[in-house]
Amino acid sequence: MAKYQTIEAAVRSEFGKGSARRARVAGQIPAVVYGADVESNLHVTVDHRTFAALVRQEGVNAVLELDIEGQKHLTMIKHIDQNVLTFNIDHLDLLAIKRGEKVEVDVPVIVEGEPAPGTMWVQDADTIKVEADVLSIPEEFKVSIEGLEFGAQVTAADIELDGDTTLVEDPETLIVNIVYPEVEAEETEDDEAASEGEEAAE
């Protein structure tokens, strides 16, 4: 993630639910910028369509340069408040950062491959927390479970990290567990119960 986009933002002069609602109706997202590089929180609005496209392309850990009426701030997404009904973005928290700074982020874990025949995989954790340079935040980590047998587990410690990225997550955090399908387990229990019933009848 060495490159980042520049998005224009406008300073908010009005506050409150009514003001935020009017901004959203006008196609804008209310946002707050905070961090060591800003003396006080900056309240701004950004274009909804432009920002939504950025998230689709770069992910929820995206780094972006915010152009606030000519003043530029390097920021990263810290929190997205999304409407549960419309899925539109209602509000943003953006952290002001510096080049060369390291930050802690939750990075998605993608499972690839198929385990041994007769087994299935269960993903216990969808993300892991790592520390990375703000301009080199991994978009995702891939974990291969190809051919893994029943009982095999993948933990946070097993994930290969890129470059200077370091693991913050507990190394023993379970990511993927290889198990037998629950249906087979239920059928086995039913068979045992039926067998016991037949023996009792005899």
Swiss-Prot record:
Part of the 50S ribosomal subunit; part of the 5S rRNA/L5/L18/L25 subcomplex. Contacts the 5S rRNA. Binds to the 5S rRNA independently of L5 and L18. One of its GO terms (molecular function) is 5S rRNA binding. GO terms for biological process: translation. HAMAP family: Ribosomal_bL25_CTC. The keyword Ribosomal protein applies. Keywords: Ribonucleoprotein, Ribosomal protein, RNA-binding, rRNA-binding. This is Large ribosomal subunit protein bL25. Signal peptide: none annotated. InterPro entries: Rbsml_bL25/Gln-tRNA_synth_N, Ribosomal_bL25/Gln-tRNA_synth, Ribosomal_bL25_b-dom, Ribosomal_bL25_C, Ribosomal_bL25_long, Ribosomal_L25_dom, Ribosomal_uL5_bac-type. Residues 182-202 are annotated as: Disordered. Residues 183-202 have a biased composition (Acidic residues). Belongs to the bacterial ribosomal protein bL25 family. CTC subfamily. This is one of the proteins that binds to the 5S RNA in the ribosome where it forms part of the central protuberance. Transmembrane segments: none annotated. One of its GO terms (cellular component) is cytosolic large ribosomal subunit.
